[in-house]
Curated annotation (Swiss-Prot):
Molecular function in Gene Ontology: DNA binding; mRNA binding; RNA binding; zinc ion binding
Compositional bias annotation for Basic and acidic residues: 11-24, 86-96
Coiled-coil parts of chain: 608-649
PANTHER family hit by this protein: RNA RECOGNITION RRM/RNP DOMAIN, ZINC FINGER PROTEIN SWM
Descriptive protein name: Zinc finger CCCH domain-containing protein 27
Organism in which the protein naturally occurs: Oryza sativa subsp. japonica
Keyword annotations: Coiled coil, DNA-binding, Metal-binding, RNA-binding, Zinc, Zinc-finger
Amino acid composition bias (Acidic residues), ranges on this chain: 33-46
Biased composition (Polar residues): 432-441, 556-576, 826-886
Length: 903
C-alpha cells in the first residue's frame, strides 16, 4: 500500500536538480500547472521556446538516459505534481502544445556531422540568422545549411561520391548567380550542380528559369573530386560535338577543334528552337561571373581559373550571346551542310564588330603549324552551337596565336606552305609558341591579307593527318576519283599532308562534304586550300615538280568526252608561263607534241586560254593525220619491198643461170631475197623517220613563231614512233665497198661513166679503176680484160642497193663481189664463192697455158687481198678474214681448173 504524502506541497529549496529518472517518470514542473501558467509572462515563454529549440538542435532520445542540461539548475521547478492524474493531464496538454516536426521519429535522428559545432561561439556568430520554415519566406534559396561549413561540405561530397551517385543534385549546391533563382520557383543555378551530375537532373517545372547564359568552361572547373562519366559519343563515335560544353569525361589526350569548317565532313546537326535543354535562355543577356566561388575548388590553379573566366566572359558578351538563343540539341534531319544550303550556317559568319581579319589588319601568321582553315561567311536562318566558338573578341594585351590541329594533336614544326589553310584564333593562355618566342610577327599589312583572302582555292582540297606509309598518290587518287576527275595531286616530301585538285568546284565540294572517312581513316581531315596549283585562266598547267605524277594521272584517269577533251588535255600540254621549259601534250593514243612556253606568255590573259585550246586541237588533229599516213606508208613500203624482192630475184636468177650452175643460182636468189627483206624495211623506216621528223619540226616551228628563241624542250618518249633514237642499231662494221670483176667492157672502163651509173643508188665515196697487168703474165690478154673497178659508198644501205640493182650498165651485165665481210655474215661469202669459180672458169676458157694459170690465179687473189686492204684500212678483221677466204677459195679455183682441163 502506497503511502501518500501528508503535505500537498514541498519546499522548493529542497528540490534543486531532479534526477533523470524523476524527470522522465514523474511530472515536470511545467506539467504541474495548467495552460494559463505558460502564458503568465514573456520571460517564461522565451525560456520554454529556447529550451525546446535546443532539444531540436541537438540529438537526443526519449530513452532512459537523457542528456543533462549544461545550463545549471532549472528555473521554475518549485511546483511538483500532486499525483498521477495531474501528471497524465499535463502530459496530454504538453505534447500537442509542442509537437515535433513531421518526419522526425523518436529514434530516427542521425548524429551530427560536427558535435562541437553548437558549442563554438565563433561558428554561431559567423552563421547567418536562420528562422524556422526555410524556403517558405523571402530568404535566398541557395543559402547553405547552417549545420555544415564549406570544408565539411567538400569532404562529405567526396565521401558520398565514392559510395554512389546522389539522389538529387540539390545536395551541397555551390553559390549560384545573383538573381539566378528564388525561393518560389526553386530553379537551380548554372554553377550550383556538380560536375559528376547528369545534366538532365534539372527542375522539370522551370527549365528556363536562369536569368543568364550558361558558362561552359566554369562547370568543369568545379572539380570536387567526384568521378565523371565517360562521354559516350567520344568513346563510340570518336568525337563529341559539344566540345568544351560537354560535362562528361573525354580523357587527357583530347583534341579541341576550334575551326568549324574542318568538321563539315560529318553530318553536323543544327539546333532546334524552343526545345528544353541545359542552359537555354529566351532572351539574350549577360550575367556577371562570380569568381570568388572558384577559389576554393580543388586541383584548379588560380591563374587557370582567371584565364578560363576571361575567355568565358568574352564569349558571353557581345553578339555571340545571340547564338545561344536556340536549343543546344542536335537534329540529324537538318545537317549543318546540306544540298539546299551549300554554304556554312549563320554560326560561321564573322561579325564585323567582334572579328574581322581584314579590318583589323591581321595576317595569317607564317608561324609553325599554321594550318587551320578560316570559316567562310554565309547567310542562313539557322544557328548552331559552333557560333559560340566562331567569334571571339581580342582581349587587351593579348596576341593572336594560330594553332594547328593534326591527328596527334601536336604542333608540327614545319615551314609555312602557302597552299595550307591558315587563320588566326585567340588563345590568351598561350601567348608564345613552342620555342618560347613571342608571336609578334602575326601583325601584317592589310593589303596582303585582303589579297590572300580574295584568292582562295576553288577546286583544291588540303588533306592533313595522312600517315606517312599511306601518303601516296595512288591511294589518294583511288579515294578522290570517286567524286570527280582529279587533275593534280601534290604531296610534299616526308609530310602528312597533300593537295588534291579537281576539275570542277562541285567535285571538290562533294569530296569535302562526304561523310565517309578519307581513305578509311577518320583522323584525316579536309580543308579548302589557299590557292589552286592550276589556275582557272590557264587551266591545265603543270609545274615541273609534279610532271611525273601528272603523267601517271593521265594514264589512270578515264578519258573524257570529245567536247571536254581539249580542256582536259590542256592541263598536260600548256606549260606554266613562269617556267623555262615546256610540258608535253598527249594525244589520244598518239605521240606527244612539244609546245614552247613563250608562245602563250606574250598573249593577253583574256585570249590566252582560247588560243591554247585552239592550238591544242590543231596539234591533236595533226597527230591523228600523221598516224594514219604513217601506217599507210608502212604498209605500202612492206608491199613494195616484197614485190621488188621477187622481181630482183627472178631477174638475177635469169642472169646467173647463163654463167653459173643451177645450185649457185639458188644461192644467189636466196641471198638477194634475204637482203631485200631485211634492208628494204630499214630503208623504209629511215624514210619514214625523216618525214616524221620534218613534220614535227615544221609544226613546232609554226607554234613557236611568236617566241624569240626556242626553249629547251623536255622530251619524254612514250612511243617508239617519234624521233628515232641515235642508238637504235648496233655498231655496223659491214663493208660498203664491192668490186666489179673483170673483164670490163671498153665503154664502161672509165671512172666518170661508172660514177654516173652508181650515183643514182646513193652517195658515192669513191670509184677506183684497178689495173691487173702487173699480175698478168699472159701478154695475149687485152687491157680491158685485166681491168677492174672498186666502188665505195658512204652507207651500207646505198652499197646494197647498187650491188643489187646496178649490174646492168649500157647493155652489159656486170659481176660484183664484196671486198670484205663481217665474221658472222654468210650472205656476202656466198657471192664470193659463186664469183671466184666463175672468174676462174672464164680464165681457163681463154688460155691454154696450164702451168701459168695457177700462178695467174694466185696472183689475182693476192692482188685482190692487197687492194681490199688499201680500200678498207680501218677494218681490223679484214686481213684475217681475207686470208681465210683465200685459203678456202684457192683449192676451189684449182679444182675448177682441173675439171676444165679434163674436159
Amino acid at each position: 500500500m502506497i503511502k501518500e504524502s501528508s503535505s500537498p506541497a514541498l519546499d522548493a529549496d529542497k528540490i534543486e536538480v531532479p534526477s533523470p529518472k524523476d524527470e522522465n517518470n514523474s511530472s515536470n514542473s511545467e506539467a504541474a500547472t495548467d495552460n494559463e501558467d505558460f502564458e503568465i509572462s514573456d520571460d517564461d515563454d522565451d525560456d520554454r521556446n529556447h529550451k525546446h529549440r535546443k532539444r531540436e538542435a541537438r540529438p537526443q532520445s526519449f530513452d532512459e538516459n537523457t542528456e543533462q542540461s549544461p545550463g545549471g539548475p532549472l528555473k521554475k521547478r518549485h511546483k511538483i505534481s500532486g499525483g498521477a492524474d495531474s501528471h497524465g493531464e499535463a502530459q496530454k496538454d504538453f505534447f500537442p502544445k509542442f509537437k515535433r516536426r513531421p518526419g522526425a521519429g523518436a529514434h530516427s535522428r542521425a548524429p551530427r556531422v560536427n558535435p562541437s559545432f553548437r558549442d563554438s561561439s565563433a561558428s554561431v556568430a559567423a552563421r547567418a540568422p536562420m528562422t524556422r520554415g526555410r524556403g517558405r519566406n523571402g530568404a535566398p534559396w541557395a543559402q547553405h545549411e547552417p549545420r555544415f561549413n564549406t570544408l565539411e561540405m567538400i569532404d562529405f561530397a567526396s565521401q558520398m561520391a565514392s559510395q554512389g551517385p546522389p539522389t538529387h543534385p540539390s545536395l551541397f549546391m555551390g553559390p549560384a548567380l545573383p538573381s539566378g533563382g528564388s525561393a518560389q520557383n526553386g530553379s537551380w543555378g548554372p554553377y550550383g550542380f556538380m560536375p559528376g551530375m547528369p545534366n538532365g537532373m534539372l527542375d522539370p517545372i522551370h527549365p528556363l528559369g536562369m536569368q543568364g547564359p550558361i558558362q561552359p568552361a566554369i562547370s568543369p572547373l568545379i572539380d570536387l573530386g567526384m568521378p565523371r562519366q565517360r562521354c559516350r559519343d567520344f568513346e563510340e563515335r570518336g568525337f563529341c560535338l559539344r566540345g568544351d560544353m560537354c560535362p562528361m569525361e573525354h580523357g587527357l589526350n583530347r583534341i579541341v577543334v576550334e575551326d568549324m569548317q574542318s568538321l563539315s565532313q560529318f553530318n553536323l546537326p543544327v539546333t532546334v528552337p524552343n526545345t528544353q535543354g541545359l542552359g537555354i535562355q529566351n532572351e539574350p543577356g549577360t550575367a556577371p561571373v562570380n569568381t570568388s566561388s572558384l577559389g576554393g575548388s580543388k586541383g584548379v590553379p588560380a591563374k587557370d581559373i582567371k584565364s578560363a573566366v576571361t575567355n568565358d566572359v568574352l564569349k558571353l558578351n557581345g553578339t555571340t550571346a545571340l547564338a545561344v538563343s536556340d536549343a543546344d540539341v542536335y537534329d540529324p534531319d537538318q545537317p549543318l551542310w546540306n544540298n539546299e544550303h551549300p554554304d556554312a550556317s549563320a554560326g560561321f559568319a564573322h561579325t564585323d564588330g567582334v572579328w574581322n581579319a581584314e579590318s583589323l589588319g591581321y595576317e595569317a601568321a607564317r608561324e609553325q603549324g599554321n594550318q587551320v582553315l578560316a570559316a567562310d561567311s554565309s547567310q542562313n536562318s539557322k544557328s548552331s552551337v559552333w557560333g559560340r566558338i566562331a567569334s571571339k573578341k581580342l582581349g587587351h594585351g593579348k596576341t593572336a596565336n594560330a594553332t594547328s590541329t593534326s591527328a596527334t594533336g601536336n604542333k608540327r614544326n614545319e615551314s609555312y606552305d602557302e597552299m595550307a589553310p591558315s587563320t588566326v584564333h585567340v588563345n590568351p593562355a598561350s601567348a608564345k609558341d613552342s620555342n618560347g618566342q613571342s608571336n609578334s610577327r602575326i601583325f601584317g599589312d592589310v593589303g596582303r591579307q585582303s589579297n590572300r583572302a580574295s584568292h582562295k582555292a576553288s577546286r583544291t582540297l588540303y588533306v592533313n593527318g595522312i600517315p606517312l606509309e599511306s601518303n601516296r598518290w595512288e591511294a589518294l587518287l583511288s579515294h578522290f576519283q570517286k567524286f570527280g576527275q582529279v587533275i593534280d595531286i601534290y604531296i610534299p616530301s616526308n609530310s602528312e599532308k597533300a593537295f588534291v585538285q579537281f576539275s570542277k568546284r562541285e567535285e571538290a565540294e562533294a569530296a569535302l562534304k562526304a561523310p565517309d572517312a578519307v581513305m578509311g581513316n577518320r583522323f584525316i581531315k579536309l580543308w579548302w586550300a589557299n590557292r589552286d596549283r592550276i589556275p582557272d585562266e590557264v587551266e591545265g598547267r603543270i609545274p615541273a615538280k609534279s610532271s611525273h605524277m601528272s603523267a601517271a594521272l593521265a594514264n589512270s584517269v578515264p578519258q573524257p568526252s570529245s567536247s571536254n577533251r581539249g580542256k582536259e588535255n590542256l592541263q598536260s600540254a600548256t606549260p606554266r608561263a613562269s617556267s623555262g621549259s615546256s610540258a608535253e601534250a598527249s594525244g589520244p593514243g598518239t605521240g606527244h607534241k612539244m609546245l614552247p612556253a613563250n608562245s602563250v606568255k606574250s598573249l593577253p590573259p583574256d585570249t590566252k586560254r582560247q588560243e591554247s585550246l585552239e592550238l591544242l586541237e590543231e596539234l591533236r588533229k595533226k597527230q591523228e593525220i600523221l598516224a594514219q599516213k604513217r601506217d599507210e606508208f608502212r604498209r605500202q613500203l612492206e608491199k613494195l619491198a616484197k614485190q621488188k624482192g621477187l622481181a630482183n630475184s627472178a631477174k638475177q636468177a635469169e642472169a646467173g643461170g647463163k654463167e653459173v650452175a643451177s645450185n649457185d643460182v639458188h644461192r644467189v636468189t636466196d641471198s638477194k631475197s634475204m637482203n631485200t627483206g631485211t634492208e628494204g624495211p630499214r630503208d623504209a623506216a629511215g624514210t619514214l623517220q625523216n618525214r616524221t621528223s620534218g613534220e614535227l619540226a615544221s609544226s613546232s616551228h609554226k607554234s613557236s613563231a611568236t617566241s624569240a628563241q626556242k626553249p629547251a624542250v623536255a622530251t619524254k618518249q612514250t612511243s617508239p614512233l617519234l624521233v628515232p633514237s641515235q642508238n637504235r642499231f648496233k655498231l655496223d662494221n659491214r663493208t660498203t665497198s664491192f668490186r666489179i670483176l673483170p673483164p670490163l667492157p671498153p665503154e664502161i672502163a672509165d671512172e666518170s661513166v661508172l660514177k654516173d651509173h652508181f650515183m643514182s643508188f646513193g652517195e658515192l665515196s669513191s670509184v677506183v679503176l684497178e689495173d691487173t697487168e702487173a699480175y698478168n703474165h699472159d701478154a695475149t690478154l687485152k687491157p680491158s680484160l685485166s681491168c677492174s673497178a672498186c666502188v665505195t659508198y658512204t652507207t651500207r644501205q646505198s652499197a646494197e642497193k647498187a650491188f643489187i640493182g646496178g649490174k646492168s650498165c649500157k647493155g652489159h651485165t656486170l659481176r660484183f663481189m664484196w671486198l670484205t665481210a663481217s665474221p658472222g655474215s654468210t650472205n656476202h661469202s656466198r657471192f664470193q664463192k659463186t664469183s671466184i669459180p666463175a672468174r676462174a672458169s672464164s680464165f681457163s676458157s681463154q688460155t691454154q697455158n696450164m702451168p701459168s694459170e695457177s700462178s695467174t690465179t694466185v696472183g689475182k687473189m693476192s692482188s685482190t687481198v692487197k687492194s681490199s686492204t688499201t680500200a678498207k684500212p680501218h677494218s681490223e678483221s679484214m686481213p684475217t678474214a681475207t686470208s681465210a677466204k683465200t685459203s678456202v677459195e684457192i683449192p676451189k679455183a684449182l679444182s675448177s681448173r682441173d675439171s676444165d682441163v679434163s674436159q
